Regions:
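Conserved core of the sugar-phosphate nucleotidyltransferase
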Residues: 1-82
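Conserved alpha/beta core of the MobA/IspD/sugar-nucleotide pyrophosphorylase nucleotidyltransferase superfamily
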Residues: 59-125
Length: 125
């Protein structure tokens, strides 16, 4: 999957990339610990969200792996946190709020992350 992600940079317009999975379960839609992303027709992120989903939109499960061009990473790390990033606790919103497009690789990768204690309990059972 990392190799596929790096291939997105063959397009010189791609500055930042990440991965989205089609494996978004019904329970995930209402789980604030599962970050969802919706995309435009070219697989660029429109928004990342934890809750309050728009029923008219299609969402994917965001997999928190990022890739950057060096100059974009330098820019990103020099930017202050945006209000949007702070409010939603999603660092990728800093990029979108500063007009850094995020290209998404779509995968059917199925995974369960452990983000909170409840996830660990569910994993152990």
């Amino acid at each position: 999957m990392i190799d596929q992600l790096s291939q997105l940079f063959e397009d010189p317009c791609v500055e930042m990339a990440s991965i989205a999975s089609t494996d978004l379960k019904e329970d995930d839609l209402n789980n604030d610990n599962v970050v969802k992303v919706n995309l435009d027709e070219e697989n660029n992120a429109i928004s990342f969200i934890r809750n309050n989903l728009n029923p008219e939109s299609t969402y994917y499960r965001h997999i928190g792996i990022y890739a950057y061009r060096k100059n974009t990473l330098n820019l990103f790390t020099s930017l202050s946190q945006s209000d949007n990033e702070k409010n939603h606790r999603l660092e990728q919103l800093r990029a979108l709020d500063n007009n850094i497009a995020i290209k998404l690789l779509i995968s059917d990768f199925s995974h369960r992350s452990i983000d909170v204690k409840e996830d660990l309990k569910n994993y152990e059972n």
